[in-house]
């Protein structure tokens, strides 16, 4: 099974990611996104970051996850090569927000991303991704395989 495929969309770029589990499709979506930024084959495991994300919806978790990784690239130049998920929890209960609103079911993802700082002298620059979007976003299980389609603003 392939991990991801790039989608050519007028004015934007997207990808489809595949996995045998929700965790795996999230990892493959992130690796696909990184491949849009640079050639990930030449990256080294020199540094690591730990990312923890919570959301009330699975699709929101995916968008938040990818946007957090984009933030680490924009702010610190960090780009990942390998990802290890340490926690993926579905349907836990979040406490209500201030004012009593919110709470209810949620999803949590915690992962360590291994990679290095992007160096334009050593790494090929491809696309500058601004954000993962909800446009045409879907995440579903088809024939025992999890699949997501996500569009990025560039």
Model-derived segments and spans:
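Glycine-biased, low-complexity coil/linker segments
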Residues: 98-102
């Amino acid at each position: 099974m392939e991990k991801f495929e790039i989608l050519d969309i007028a004015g934007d770029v997207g990808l489809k990611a595949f996995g045998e589990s929700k965790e795996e499709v999230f990892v493959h979506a992130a690796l696909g996104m990184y491949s849009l930024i640079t050639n990930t084959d030449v990256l080294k495991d020199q540094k690591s970051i730990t990312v923890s994300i919570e959301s009330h919806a699975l699709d929101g978790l995916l968008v938040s996850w990818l946007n957090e990784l984009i933030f680490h690239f924009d702010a610190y130049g960090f780009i990942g090569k390998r990802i290890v998920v340490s926690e993926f929890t579905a349907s836990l209960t979040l406490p209500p927000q201030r004012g009593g609103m919110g709470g209810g079911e949620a999803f949590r993802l915690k992962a360590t991303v291994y990679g290095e700082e992007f160096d334009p002298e050593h790494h090929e620059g491809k696309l500058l991704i601004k954000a993962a979007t909800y446009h045409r976003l879907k995440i579903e299980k088809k024939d025992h395989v999890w699949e997501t389609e996500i569009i990025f603003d560039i």
